């Protein structure tokens, strides 16, 4: 069995001698020899840089949500305006991350389109593994962003539920105003009241009673209007929460439909490829059958000719 010899040192000596013969100084020779030990980091492609940038943005969004989680959910830590500003910042983060992912998807599609040659066939420089790797990177980023968005949807649903609970109408018992007529006072002071005042007093009491009845009716009407306004506000908040949940589910269904469409397109391509291979197999089978028939026919005539010749 032959032995293997390590020629690394001989190679380094040859490189050092070549560098000295070319005219390298000591610093250049040292940097050249150091390159064998410490390799330069490979330069990242634009796609990889954009993917890492998107991942950093998603991580930053997750940290922002974790930092302001209590401020957004707690009822008494922040005001509604501050919660709305937090929600707007998170929405801007999500929109920016989604745009970055769309840019990555468009770059993959452009690369696939440019890699196709004549008649839509793959060119020589087409790398299917690289394309598949990039699709996997985009899928991982999309799932990461979707998980962070789902967490924020849970926080938003909690906030909406708290708003609904606070906006529920609290019915207060209606106070019945009972007016005590000053009978005793009237009776007590009847001796000192003049006859004209005695005749005008029932009229005043009647007017006062009418005013009290109108005031009570207005209070009841205003209370009913307030209850109706609170119910309308509650329904509007519920509709807003339902609209948001519906938009989230519609987005998820759109992603699922797009994924199913891609799978259907891929399945159609596989079926077409299978049909081509099946037709080729049928042609090969028919040609082999013809060859066997011709072979047996020639063999039969050869045997008959040999028998006749002998």
UniProtKB/Swiss-Prot annotation:
It is found in: Membrane. GO terms for cellular component: membrane. GO terms for biological process: protein transport; vesicle-mediated transport. Residues 77-114 form a coiled coil. Residues 1-289 are cytoplasmic. The keyword Transmembrane applies. The chain crosses the membrane at residues 290-310. Keywords: Coiled coil, Membrane, Protein transport, Transmembrane, Transmembrane helix, Transport. InterPro entries: SNARE, Syntaxin-18_N. It is a single-pass type IV membrane protein. The keyword Nucleotide-binding does not apply. Vesicle trafficking protein that functions in the secretory pathway. PANTHER family: SYNTAXIN-18. Belongs to the syntaxin family. Part of the t-SNARE complex. Interacts with MAG2. This is Syntaxin-81. The gene is SYP81.
